[in-house]
Structures are given as C-alpha cells and as structure tokens.
C-alpha cells in the first residue's frame, strides 16, 4: 500500500475546450513551484493527478493554497484486485468517524469485473460483515468510502477543501492599490483566485505615515505571496501631492482628488510594466469617496479597466474573508495610511466631474505625477 494525495482541480478548467491543456499545464507548474521544498513525485493515472509526498501533512497545507485546486484527497493505492480493495476499504472505515457510511466506486478501467454499483455493494457488505456497529446510509452518510479503479485502485475517505478558483497567471495581470487596511488585500486575493497575476502599489506619505506603516504593507504583500508566489511592490511617495491638494483645493474635495491622482499614477506604472488593469478594495457606499458618483469621478482619471471585486460586499463579509486568508490581524495593526491622515470632516459624497476638473486646474498635475512616478521604489516580495 502506498499513500498519495489526489489533487482535484476546479470544474471550470474542464470547460475550457481546446485551451484546457494550457490551464492544466499552468496549474501543474504552480503545484510544482509550491512543493519545491518538499520531496515529491508527480504520478499521472488516466487523467488523474496523484502526488507522492515525503510529508503528507505539509503537502496538504501547501496544496490547499494553490488557486485552481478545489479538493485534496488522501488516498491509499493498492493493486486493482478485489481482495486488496476490500482490505483497504475496511481499514478506511475503521479509521473514519461516524456510524453510517456509503461506498462510491468509479471504474475508469472497464475491464475490472462487475459494474461500479456491484463493486460498491460487495465492498459495503464486506465492511458491514467486519464492523457490525456500522450501517449503510445512501442519502446522508457520516462518511464515504471512495474507490477509483484505474491501472491501480485508489481508496480514500479523507477530503480536504482547497481554495478553488482558476490557476494563477492564466487571466492577465493587475496592479492592486494595496493600503494597510482590511479591504485591499482581500480584493487582491479575490483577483488572484480568478487567475489574475498580482502586482501592488502603495502610496506612502512620509513623515505623516511611519516606516512601520510601510512595513505593514510589505507584510500584507508577503501574506498574499503565500498564495501567488513573488509579487512586485511599487512604493510611491505621495506627500507632496497631498500637500499641494490641501493648499490649493477645497477641503471637501480632498479625498476624491487624491483618489484621482492615485489612479493616474497607478495607470502610468501599469503602462510602464505592461500591466493590464488596476484593482482597488473599494465597496459601494462604504465610505464617502466610494459612492456611485465618487467612483465614476475616480474612474475618469484611469486609462484602463479598474476592477473592484469587493464592490457589493458588506464589511462583515470582507472581514470574514480577511480572517480566512490570514491578512486580518496584520491589517488591523494601528498604523495610518495616506488615505486616512488627511480626511476632511465633511467630504463631498456626490462630486461632479466638471467641478473636480475645475479644482484640479490649480495643480500642476503632469509635474506632480511625473515626480511621484520617477521617485517610485520597486521591491520584489
């Protein structure tokens, strides 16, 4: 008997037609990359992906975070022989918790005697004969004994849910506006889960935001890296722009004008590094600048798609995802970001584009943006 991990990938990949092979290859490459510090062997059996791993538990923990993997099963490989399958199925039943079970059989090898239903009945009868306190429940069992008969037979009961989604790196790229808050890391995670490659930009307002605030953002990027691999982080100085806006624009327009500057800078950085889009952690109506009118005015400053994956999510739901992915505790550390230090008491919630453009005429937009882009620091996380 050999213990393996059966990797099941997202059903969406099956729907990719002629492109299915491209998605499978990318997922396989991502799996190999995340297992590079674990001794393993990739085994293919009639379209199924099995991984022989030196450390099963470590392998499970790593594979759970691979986008595109939706389930991991701990399987025992035996010879495709009915007696061997019976013995292993009985062991699985004895190791499982519960008083009811169901046997599910898949015969990829149609030369194996009997139908799938007949094999399930025979295995179920054998388990009942040897474990009298168990009973069969075909509708709502406490546990399953799963059997797949291929070149070998694979028996398993333990299934671990993974992150699902699409293989990372199969759906273009984006530049995430990463602040130190709760929302933006979750937005980045959700885009990455759909296969979008992440790059991040952070706007730093020294000395009003501390070096510790910058370190906090690096830590958040590092947590996201656990799901994606290396991330490019661009750190843009934003103090001079904020000072100019405060000095020359109306106080109730500060936030929306700052957001428009961020959009301009993000788009120029994106263009410079061949990044297709921009992503933000904005949610409709969550704060004053995230009204429908505010988002429309912000968007007007962008020259490429701006994605907002949290747009219809409640704050409680966003916080729940942040806890699940491991960013929440870092996000709530008490360090200010550039969007919170100069917030006006009564920000404009329904800005009008022409009024904002008129206010911006007091600023040398091109010079301010160019200087910020030129002084942007690059880090590989």
UniProtKB/Swiss-Prot annotation:
UniProt EC number: 2.8.1.4
Biological process according to GO: thiamine biosynthetic process; thiamine diphosphate biosynthetic process; thiazole biosynthetic process; tRNA 4-thiouridine biosynthesis
InterPro entries: Rossmann-like_a/b/a_fold, ThiI_AANH, ThiI_fer, ThiI_N, THUMP_dom, THUMP_ThiI, tRNA_STrfase, tRNA_sulfurtransferase_ThiI
UniProt KW RNA-binding keyword: yes
Highest taxon of source: Bacteria
Catalytic reactions of this protein: [ThiI sulfur-carrier protein]-S-sulfanyl-L-cysteine + a uridine in tRNA + 2 reduced [2Fe-2S]-[ferredoxin] + ATP + H(+) = [ThiI sulfur-carrier protein]-L-cysteine + a 4-thiouridine in tRNA + 2 oxidized [2Fe-2S]-[ferredoxin] + AMP + diphosphate; [ThiS sulfur-carrier protein]-C-terminal Gly-Gly-AMP + S-sulfanyl-L-cysteinyl-[cysteine desulfurase] + AH2 = [ThiS sulfur-carrier protein]-C-terminal-Gly-aminoethanethioate + L-cysteinyl-[cysteine desulfurase] + A + AMP + 2 H(+)
SMART domains xref list: THUMP
Enzyme class: transferase
Keyword RNA-binding: yes
Keywords: ATP-binding, Cytoplasm, Nucleotide-binding, RNA-binding, Thiamine biosynthesis, Transferase, tRNA-binding
Pathway noted in the entry: Cofactor biosynthesis; thiamine diphosphate biosynthesis
Pfam families recorded: ThiI, ThiI_fer, THUMP
PROSITE patterns hit by this protein: THUMP (PS51165)
UniProt-annotated location(s): Cytoplasm
Binding-site residues, ATP: 177-178, 202-203, 259, 281, 290
Domain (THUMP) ranges: 57-160
Stored CDD domains: PPase_ThiI, THUMP_ThiI
GO MF, one annotated term: CCA tRNA nucleotidyltransferase activity
GO cellular component: cytosol
HAMAP family in alphabetical order: ThiI
PANTHER family found in the cross-reference section: TRNA SULFURTRANSFERASE
Protein role: Catalyzes the ATP-dependent transfer of a sulfur to tRNA to produce 4-thiouridine in position 8 of tRNAs, which functions as a near-UV photosensor. Also catalyzes the transfer of sulfur to the sulfur carrier protein ThiS, forming ThiS-thiocarboxylate. This is a step in the synthesis of thiazole, in the thiamine biosynthesis pathway. The sulfur is donated as persulfide by IscS.
NCBIfam families with a match to the protein in the record: tRNA uracil 4-sulfurtransferase ThiI
Family: Belongs to the ThiI family.
Protein name as annotated: Probable tRNA sulfurtransferase
Gene, per the UniProt record: thiI
